[in-house]
C-alpha cells in the first residue's frame, strides 16, 4: 500500500497541495496535485471524465487501476509511476491517482510561460524575429522547426539535486566532433550542484572563464543562431526555465558575427566586419593611447595640436588618468542605468544624462573637451558588440591598458597588446583553440586562400576550418 499519510503531512508546508478522496466500496481512490503548477481545467477534464464513467459502477472494486482507466477512457495518455517518484511528478505539474499500491500520473501542467516574442537582447531588422522563452519544449520545438532531419540528436539530462532541471544537449550526429561531444557530455554529467536555475549556471560550471577573461561559451536567445551553429558541427545546450541557449565551442571571430549578416549582401558583410574590428581596437586602445601620449609621449603630436590639448587641460585640476576615470565611471553609471531602466525611458535618460553631465563637467573645468570626445568615441565603438560577456572582456582590458599607459606610456600599451594576443592564442574552448578560425592549421595549398580572405572567412568554411 502506498503511504498516503506523508502527503497529508506535506500540506503543512505546501498549502497548494490538493488531496481528494473518492470511495469505491471499501477502498479509496486518491487524487493529488499541486494547484499552483497544475491546470485545474486539465485536471477536471481527465479526472472527472474518468470518475463520471466510473460512477455508474461505483460499488464495483477496481482490480487494476491502469487497466481500468484504459478501459473507461482509452484516448487518455498517462504513465504508471513508482511511489518514490510521486513527489517529483507532483512538482512538475502532474496529477497523480493513487489506488492501493498503484500510482498513475496524468500530465496536467499549467501554462506558466510567456509566448514566443521578439529577442530583447539581440534585436534584428531582417530575418526571423522569434526567440526562446522559459518553456523547455517550446525551445526545442523552435530548433526542430528549422532542422527537419534525423541527424538532430538530443541527449536529455537532469541537473540540480534541489531543482531537478531538465537539460538537453543538441547536436547533428553526422557532422559533430565526437571528441568534443564526449567532453561536453562528461563535463555536464559531472556537475554537482543543488541548483541549476538557468543555462548561465551550467556555463559557469563547465567553462574555464574563471581562469580567463575571455568568454569561451556563447549564449543566445535566437533559435536561428542555434540552428546555424548546429549545422557548423557545434553543440548547443538548452535548459528548462531558461530563455538562453549555450553554443559550444565558441571562437574569437564569432563575436564579430551578427545574425543579420546571413541576410545581407556579401560585400556589405565584409565592410561591416572591417568596421567591427576597427571598433574593437578603438574601444580598447583609444583611451590608453591618449593617456600615453598626453602623459609621456607628447612628441608624437604635432606642435599645434599639443598646444591646443595643453590649453584645454590647463584648468583641469586632475591628472589625465583621474580625469579619464571620472568620465569612464560616469559612462559606466549611465550604461548600467540604461540596462536596468525600462526601454521606454532608459535611452532618453542616457542621452540626457550624457549631454548634461558632459557639458557641465567641461564648463566646470573638471574635465577637458578632448577627454569627453575620447570617452564618447570609446563608448560608441563598444555598441557594436551586443554580447554582454564580450563587453565585460572589453572593459577589463580597457582599464588595464589605461593603467599601463599612465605609468609606462606607449611602451605600456605595446606590452598590454602583446599580453592580450598571447592570452588569446593560449585559450581553448573545449579543446579547440580560441583563435582557430583566424589562425587555423593550414596546409601549403590553403595558405594563399587564407591570405586572400583574411578575417573574411565565409560561414560555409568555418566548420571545416575549426575541425582541422
Task: Give the residues covered by each predicted segment.
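Membrane-embedded alpha-helical signal segments
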Residues: 1-285, 299-303, 424-468
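Amphipathic alpha-helical protein-protein interaction surfaces
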Residues: 148, 314, 366, 409-410
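Active-site proximal loops enriched in glycine and acidic residues that flank catalytic Cys/His/Asp
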Residues: 239-241, 320, 343, 408
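Transmembrane alpha-helical segments that form the functional core of multipass membrane systems
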Residues: 251-399
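Hydrophobic alpha-helical transmembrane segments of membrane transport and translocation systems
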Residues: 369-371, 375-468
Amino acid at each position: 500500500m502506498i503511504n498516503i499519510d506523508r502527503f497529508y503531512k506535506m500540506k503543512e508546508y505546501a498549502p497548494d497541495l490538493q488531496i481528494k478522496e473518492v470511495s469505491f466500496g471499501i477502498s479509496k481512490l486518491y487524487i493529488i496535485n499541486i494547484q499552483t503548477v497544475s491546470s485545474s481545467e486539465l485536471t477536471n477534464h481527465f479526472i472527472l471524465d474518468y470518475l463520471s464513467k466510473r460512477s455508474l459502477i461505483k460499488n464495483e472494486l477496481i482490480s487494476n487501476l491502469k487497466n481500468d482507466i484504459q478501459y473507461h477512457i482509452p484516448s487518455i495518455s498517462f504513465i504508471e509511476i513508482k511511489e518514490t517518484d510521486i513527489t517529483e511528478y507532483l512538482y512538475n505539474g502532474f496529477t497523480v491517482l493513487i489506488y492501493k499500491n498503484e500510482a498513475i500520473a496524468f500530465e496536467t501542467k499549467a501554462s506558466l510561460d510567456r509566448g514566443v516574442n521578439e529577442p530583447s537582447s539581440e534585436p534584428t531588422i531582417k530575418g526571423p524575429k522569434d526567440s526562446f522563452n522559459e518553456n523547455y519544449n517550446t525551445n526545442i520545438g523552435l530548433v526542430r522547426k528549422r532542422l527537419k532531419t534525423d541527424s538532430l540528436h538530443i541527449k536529455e539530462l537532469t541537473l540540480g539535486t534541489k531543482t531537478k532541471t531538465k537539460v538537453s544537449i543538441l547536436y547533428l550526429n553526422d557532422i559533430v566532433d565526437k571528441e568534443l561531444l564526449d567532453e561536453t557530455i562528461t563535463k555536464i554529467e559531472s556537475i554537482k550542484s543543488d541548483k541549476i536555475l538557468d543555462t548561465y549556471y551550467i556555463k559557469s560550471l563547465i567553462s574555464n572563464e574563471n581562469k580567463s577573461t575571455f568568454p569561451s561559451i556563447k549564449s543566445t536567445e535566437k533559435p536561428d543562431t542555434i540552428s546555424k551553429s548546429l549545422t557548423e558541427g557545434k553543440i548547443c545546450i538548452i535548459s528548462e526555465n531558461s530563455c538562453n541557449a549555450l553554443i559550444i565551442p565558441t571562437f574569437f571571430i564569432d563575436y564579430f558575427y551578427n545574425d543579420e549578416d546571413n541576410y545581407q549582401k556579401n560585400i556589405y558583410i565584409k565592410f561591416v566586419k572591417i568596421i567591427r574590428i576597427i571598433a574593437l581596437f578603438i574601444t580598447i586602445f583609444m583611451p590608453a593611447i591618449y593617456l600615453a601620449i598626453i602623459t609621456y609621449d607628447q612628441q608624437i603630436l604635432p606642435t599645434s595640436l599639443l598646444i591646443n590639448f595643453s590649453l584645454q587641460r590647463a584648468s583641469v585640476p586632475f591628472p589625465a588618468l583621474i580625469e579619464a576615470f571620472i568620465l569612464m565611471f560616469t559612462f559606466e553609471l549611465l550604461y548600467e542605468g540604461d540596462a536596468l531602466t525600462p526601454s521606454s525611458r532608459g535611452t532618453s535618460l542616457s542621452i540626457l544624462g550624457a549631454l548634461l553631465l558632459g557639458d557641465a563637467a567641461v564648463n566646470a573645468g573638471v574635465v577637458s573637451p578632448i577627454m569627453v570626445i575620447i570617452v564618447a568615441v570609446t563608448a560608441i565603438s563598444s555598441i557594436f558588440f551586443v554580447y554582454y560577456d564580450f563587453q565585460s572582456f572589453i572593459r577589463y582590458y580597457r582599464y588595464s591598458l589605461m593603467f599601463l599607459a599612465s605609468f609606462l606610456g606607449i611602451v605600456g600599451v605595446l606590452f598590454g597588446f602583446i599580453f592580450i594576443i598571447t592570452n588569446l592564442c593560449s585559450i581553448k574552448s573545449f579543446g579547440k583553440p580560441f583563435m582557430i578560425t583566424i589562425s587555423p592549421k593550414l596546409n601549403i595549398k590553403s595558405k594563399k586562400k587564407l591570405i586572400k580572405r583574411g578575417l573574411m572567412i565565409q560561414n560555409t568554411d568555418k566548420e571545416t576550418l575549426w575541425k582541422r
